[in-house]
Amino acid sequence: MPKRTDIQSILILGAGPIVIGQACEFDYSGAQACKALREEGYRVILVNSNPATIMTDPDMADATYIEPIQWEVVRKIIEKERPDAVLPTMGGQTALNCALALEKHGVLAEFGVEMIGATADAIDKAEDRSRFDKAMKSIGLECPRADTAKTMEEAYKVLDMVGFPCIIRPSFTMGGTGGGIAYNKEEFEEICRRGLDLSPTNELLIDESLIGWKEYEMEVVRDKADNCIIVCSIENFDPMGIHTGDSITVAPAQTLTDKEYQLMRNASLAVLREIGVETGGSNVQFGINPKDGRMVIIEMNPRVSRSSALASKATGFPIAKIAAKLAVGFTLDELQNDITGGATPASFEPTIDYVVTKIPRFNFEKFAGANDRLTTQMKSVGEVMAIGRNQQESLHKALRGLEVGATGFDEMVDLDSPDALTKIRHELKEAGAERIWYIADAFRAGMSVDGVFNLTNIDRWFLVQIEEIVKLEEQVKAGGFAGLTQDVLRQMKRKGFSDARLSKLLGVAESEIRRLRDQFDIHPVYKRVDTCAAEFSSDTAYMYSSYDDECEANPTDKEKIMVLGGGPNRIGQGIEFDYCCVHASLALREDGYETIMVNCNPETVSTDYDTSDRLYFEPVTLEDVLAIARVEKPKGVIVQYGGQTPLKLARALEAAGVPIIGTSPDAIDRAEDRERFQQAVDRLGLLQPENATVTTMEQAVEKSREIGFPLVVRPSYVLGGRAMEIVYDEQDLRRYFNEAVSVSNESPVLLDRFLDDAIEVDIDAICDGERVVIGGIMEHIEQAGVHSGDSACSLPAYTLSQEIQDKMREQVEKLAFELGVRGLMNTQFAVKDNEVYLIEVNPRAARTVPFVSKATGAPLAKIAARVMAGQSLESQGFTKEIIPPYYSVKEVVLPFNKFPGVDPLLGPEMRSTGEVMGVGATFAEAYAKAELGCGNVYPEGGRALLSVREGDKQRVVDLASKLLKLGYKLDATHGTAVILGEAGINPRLVNKVHEGRPHILDRIKNNEYTYIVNTAAGRQAIEDSKVLRRGALAEKVNYTTTLNAAFATCMSHTADAKASVTSVQELHAQVQASLKA
């Protein structure tokens, strides 16, 4: 059946901001769907609130709405655009839930919009736990013993049936939010209450524990003629009990017998037929009891998922693209497989002759007090994928691609310490983020494969692979450097050992190992991911390295530019950097260069096989990048776009003769190295907060007496504010040195005078050596002291005077010329008492670039990439700053609900995972839209609680009167109440927790408040008020931890976020019109 002609326009629902459990894999699927549907001539309308996505670029869809993904707002878009159909399977749980709400509220019926890709009934049948259970029984498949509960009473009835331990999962949530494993009554009570609260339908599924069972996933695609293919089987290295998003996974499945595989394959197809998925991709999860082979079905997702992004990258089969085409009526046999250049149809199941390993990336160090053990609730923030010819090579490459400082199976424990074995046993039994390294330590300590299996339930086949790696390491150590013969070295490289790991084992420099490989002529060759195990020739240059015989890279002799990606997502380095890498590649491709992408993150658009001319799916480490450069010989390499990951390699690459284009590694160092930067600033006569660099605690104390408190303290060279703190007194400073950092001559600590209450400003600019053009000036809403990545911001500025802005423009220009920037530069300022202080300069792409590009319509990353390749700004027609005739506000999304026990106070350490954007004619409207996009819905009126720090007491009176005007009743804690009383406002007095009951927490728990403003400064005050913020979070009360955000919230009450919708294309037309005027 060819495509449908009865529909002309299709609305695609995006996934919104990046949160734990729902990351940039949906930008990848959404961007593919837009491309696929426009290719077929449909008009595509897209809604997604996340500006840091490729899919919201103005040329990806015909009409793009960066608006909150909420049914009332989407109804406005449907009313305006009148699409014929809506495709809800590309935007994760957010899109599914929104589509179901549109259906439930009659919006689809009202405007005659058809749901394609999945029916409301199929979504409901897969997501509603009790319906799913019945459906599985009807086709003879077993589910875990389970039942649903809507109250605590019902929950206890289910418990009687399943017993302890049991697994609790809320319905219609994502990434296991709110779920957990209960081993006793107390835990059961706590998890159930939390789950009932977090499920949109207030429903839980409680099932028998399958902890220790093996877990598998099948990625299935089905069309309406009932053709089904399995794209990929995935096996979880970690057994059941750990969320599959937090598990190490391997594809294809390694430990299934052929008979088991066929059983599972048939079961997956039966599931899709029964649920009624007619068009597109689904993922089906199974559990197998290793003791008796009993197989149960755990769940299925009737949409494109995190696993489908992984399966697409693992096989080269573009699931989202195919799913989008199936949704408009095509069948699999009518679609061509791009990778084999159309030699095979999409109805051929991919076959792969390599092993793929995915390892999740965690960020527990950012959440002091978080429970860092892995359970059924997802906690990882990103992932890395690696491809190898065998399991050991694949595993090794994934470990070094993670960028957690590992070069392979590095030792975690000092085996001579008395409690080494106790520590190892604990880490094996109670899995944390680092269990795989502890497994290697267990073998080093003499544990047997069975001993490790009994503690972990990880299949013995995987354990034997790790045991062998440990044995090989012992042999290398015993043989010493002289024992590295050509044969030994080649064998080690085939097993995936990195030069860095071998150098560690032998105690020589990494360059020594590289020299030896050159001498023996041992270099990696590149194999192609071709979907067909090399049975047909592949047109697509999608490569991975191995130490095999035949190289399939076949490089061309065109002019090439290589872009280094950012590796796995993590807090502080996320999708924004991938967005820049993709833009660099697209722009340079348009200009006729051959572009080469190097990256190892399976969720992203940059690792899509048709984003660049050639894709190398490899870890972004010095060894791997040098090997690719040796084969490809690029004219230039871009290191400034992937965040800190490629930037760290700049000097070493340059030293090895790799040509870095754009800002030179030396200039990058001048901005990053404190002392060299200081010299540049002094030469230009710019103002900086007083600061000092220290290498001992004594020095720090001495300097602090000169500079004065409060101080911002941090280690040098860091992204996302790791281990950064504001200290208020000497005792605090000493504690920081004892607890937070190891300070030394190699790693000094920086002290800066903290400008309390200053307004922070971010400026992105491009310099081509002749001129500097400002991309945008963003005024932060949270005051200085909150990490810029965690602060909301407005473009244009909403309170700063023209005079101050001009002062900053002038300084940016001077700095760009002084540092010799070629390409993008990000500068941060703080404004206090009409003085402009320079905080820092980053001569690279910053995380604000996508937001500025969407707000102004100027594609900064593309323009700057062309500058790096030698074009001037003038030749590109970008010569002056664009100030849009509307306001854009970026707001961040924080993951605190996943980490009970962590203080949600914003500070200098970055902890947000994603962002949304709101646009409006006024600042108030833009801010209101951004808040709605984050899901912060502020009720009209109610009761507000004010409890503020000393420094905020002057301004709190103004805030209180604004809240009264908006119809709020006021409560305040003692200090704040006294100030308000003096101003003639008499709030109700509430007790702090240690002042007797009923206290603040009691009132929060009784749902007395609709809004809480709490600011705190100083170690003790922050500690004392932590229970207040945790309470607000737990009871879902809106709260702000800065006064500026509270004032912005008051302003936003005057605007209606749902009143109007405007597409990006219309906004950019307004910009163009204002430029002509």
Curated annotation (Swiss-Prot):
Residue numbers spanned by region Carboxyphosphate synthetic domain: 1-403
Keyword Manganese: yes
Residues spanning the signal sequence: none
Sequence ranges assigned to domain ATP-grasp in this UniProt record: 133-328, 678-869
Cofactor(s) needed for function: Mg(2+); Mn(2+)
GO MF terms, alphabetically ordered: ATP binding; carbamoyl-phosphate synthase (ammonia) activity; carbamoyl-phosphate synthase (glutamine-hydrolyzing) activity; metal ion binding
Annotated region described as Oligomerization domain, given as residue ranges: 404-553
Binding site for Mg(2+) 3: 828, 840
Domain of life according to the entry: Bacteria
Annotated ATP 2 binding sites: 714, 753, 755, 760, 785-788, 828, 840
Entry comment, domain topic: The large subunit is composed of 2 ATP-grasp domains that are involved in binding the 2 ATP molecules needed for carbamoyl phosphate synthesis. The N-terminal ATP-grasp domain (referred to as the carboxyphosphate synthetic component) catalyzes the ATP-dependent phosphorylation of hydrogencarbonate to carboxyphosphate and the subsequent nucleophilic attack by ammonia to form a carbamate intermediate.
Identification of the protein by name: Carbamoyl phosphate synthase large chain
Organism: Vibrio vulnificus (strain YJ016)
Gene name for this UniProt entry: carB
